[in-house]
Amino acid sequence: MLYQLLHTVLSVVGVSLNAFMMYLALTKSPKIMLPCSAIITIKTFTDILTSAMSFFVMQRIVTDGSSILVIPTGPCTHLGPTACYIGHMFMLCFLECNLIWMISSYIFRYYILYVRDPSIKSLVFVAICLSIPSFIHMATWISNYDPTVAIAIPENVGIESRDMVLGGTIVTWSALTLIIQLFITSILVLIAYAWIRNTLLSFAVKMGSDKNDVKKLNTRLVKVINFQVFLPSFIFLGVFVFVGMFTQLIDPKISQYLVSVIFMFSPICSPFSYILFVPHYLNVILGNKKVSEAKSTTEGCTFRHVNMAASTSNTPECSA
């Protein structure tokens, strides 16, 4: 019961924070920031879906090294094991799409910096194209899932007779595959972060001392990505707990509750990278309307008169 309450609180907080951030991006962003607001909207949308699936399944992941079992405790249990397995796959898939979009947003930042602003349609199109492989992969596993397969439940792992248990070859290999993919994608996020951070710092040096507005905007953006680089750390921590359980270094009676909970902190913390380090959104929240409008005007002037450097005036909020 306590575990379900914790999952409910985390899911509600995740949905609420990201819905609020999406509202700010859609309704409170200046027109010069439209591409950036689209990038934020897509990111927060995947975070909302991740949080919703976490509530729907409220899963525990158990392994003794020979098999992987998923124990759902959420509303999906009223719909049957197939619905719970679908929810389990969707949650892991949305987590992966979230990481992939972070990498893509770094690439878009570079594109905005040195080429031009992408259109909203192109951003949405890219987001859809990037999600297709993950959903095809997920659909393949779901189509092969058999809820009637016999499950061997290991002893002394804290599973009770009343628990719904998802297991079998498909559950084991699908969960293992997606967790490995999350780990690899998180590493790619760190590599992309190092690349775009060096790019932004190099660009700031090239600007010179006479373009302070642009350099300030770049500084804000670096702060955003410095905060966001900690988001994959929750994925790493969850994977490490799973590996400890898989190798029997950690007692599964406790660690089975940790993996999904740790994963949930990534979508919960994500909106704070914009709220804390993007002055425009922070001023809106604090009610400093005049300050917010003044900063937007300054950014607009920078955008119109600094040529290539002006592209960065669109980038302070271009963060996944």
Curated annotation (Swiss-Prot):
Biological processes per GO annotation: short-term memory
Gene Ontology cellular-component annotations: membrane
Locations listed in the record: Membrane
InterPro entries linked to this entry: 7TM_GPCR_serpentine_rcpt_Srd, Nematode_rcpt-like_delta
Primary localization class, coarse: membrane
Superkingdom per UniProt: Eukaryota
Listed transmembrane segments: 5-25, 38-58, 83-103, 122-142, 176-196, 230-250, 258-278
Keyword terms of this UniProt record: Membrane, Transmembrane, Transmembrane helix
Membrane topology note: Multi-pass membrane protein
Pfam families in UniProt: 7TM_GPCR_Srd
UniProt record similarity statement: Belongs to the nematode receptor-like protein srd family.
Name of this protein: Serpentine receptor class delta-28
Organism of derivation: Caenorhabditis elegans
